[in-house]
Regions:
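N-terminal Lys/Arg-rich, disordered targeting/topogenic segments
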Residues: 1-38, 316-335
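Solvent-exposed, non-transmembrane regions of membrane-associated and secreted proteins
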Residues: 28-284, 314-321
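C-terminal single-pass membrane-anchor helix
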Residues: 276-335
Length: 335
């Protein structure tokens, strides 16, 4: 055998000895500590991620519930506050609004979501000065769509995030022959219900508008879906008292506008007020319940899976510990 072959054999034997050398106690402790850190990480991380996921899912539920509750509180407070104004103030404010509707010049009616609907003009300022004894102009209730919301001046983004907006260029919502008021509401907001259910309304349904101490009832006569620039149906009609509720559609896409138009039903104010008072929309929506039920189901499933995983982990750790003890015993006997 050559000298080169002998050295190669010695090198191979040395490598095999190194590979077969058992780990020291210090190395074993380091390995165990690293494994423990990994186990703790994988034990803590899933619950943290689960809690974060639940909070993300619960946010729209909680936000929508609070906003719905607040909007209904404002609508109810509006009715109660009218008694504090006094009959003369109420009469004067309504007379001014009626006169405004009679004198308002015909103007092009534009889509509520256009930026040009926020004009800096004397005409717009005059409109804002009407029915301004309260921050809320009026309220609207739609029983078949589960709607009870305050109405504000204008259709600015900030306005439509807290309630319904009166579309500038249309009559104030005080009723009157030859008037047509247009009320705008969002649908698809992640933090409020607003006009989400306006598509439930059918011809023949009714809705109510309360403005100061005047109560108006409208019966739905027309429902249509149009493009944003198709506003002809929002014009006044001689001899008719009309109100249109408008929102974006389809849900979440918003390429069109849903128009729900009603004609005023001649009724005594007290009768309308009594009917309107019965409208009590649900603050909690069906989808909220579905989300909460889904979260509970996920929690139960997670608890079951975590229990199985924990049981298997303990079994595996016990087997590893037994194997280490056995290996240590074997090394001791070999020594």
């Amino acid at each position: 055998m050559s000298e080169h072959e002998i050295h190669a054999g010695d090198s191979l034997s040395s490598t095999q000895v190194q590979e077969e050398t058992p780990e020291t106690a210090e190395e074993r402790d380091q390995r165990i500590r690293k494994a423990g850190r990994r186990r703790r990480l994988f034990t803590i991380l899933p619950p943290v991620l689960l809690v974060l996921g639940i909070l993300v899912l619960l946010y729209p539920v909680i936000a929508t519930y609070q906003n719905n509750l607040e909007q209904q509180r404002i609508a109810k407070a509006f009715s109660a506050e009218q008694t504090n104004l006094g009959p003369d103030v109420l009469k004067d404010e309504l007379a001014r609004a009626d006169e405004y509707n009679r004198q308002a010049a015909e103007a092009p009616i534009l889509d509520p979501w256009l930026e040009s609907q926020r004009p800096n003009t004397p005409q717009y300022s005059n409109c804002l000065s009407q029915l301004d004894v309260n921050p809320v102009m009026a309220t609207v209730k739609v029983p078949s769509a589960d709607i009870s919301l305050p109405i504000y001046h204008g259709t600015e983004t900030s306005t439509l995030e807290k309630g319904v907006g009166h579309l500038f260029g249309t009559a104030l919502p005080v009723g009157g022959e030859g008037t047509h008021t247009v009320l705008t509401g969002h649908s698809g907001l992640g933090s409020a219900t607003m006009f989400d259910h306006l598509n439930r309304v059918k011809v023949g349904d009714v809705f109510y508008i309360e403005v100061l101490d005047r109560h108006l009832k409208y019966k739905v006569t027309d429902i249509r879906t149009v493009l944003p620039n198709e506003t002809e149906s929002l014009n006044k009609v001689a001899g008719k008292d009309l109100a249109t509720l408008i929102t974006c559609t389809p849900y979440g896409i918003n390429t069109h506008r849903l128009l729900v138009t009603g004609e005023r039903v001649p009724m005594d104010d007290q009768q309308v007020a009594a009917e309107s008072a019965k409208v009590e929309p649900a603050v909690i929506q069906t989808w909220m319940i579905a989300v909460v039920v889904g979260i509970i189901a996920v929690l139960i499933a997670t608890a079951v899976l975590w229990g199985f995983a924990r049981k298997n982990r303990k079994k595996r750790e016990a087997e590893e510990a037994a194997a280490e003890v056995s290996a240590a015993s074997g090394n001791g006997e070999g020594a």
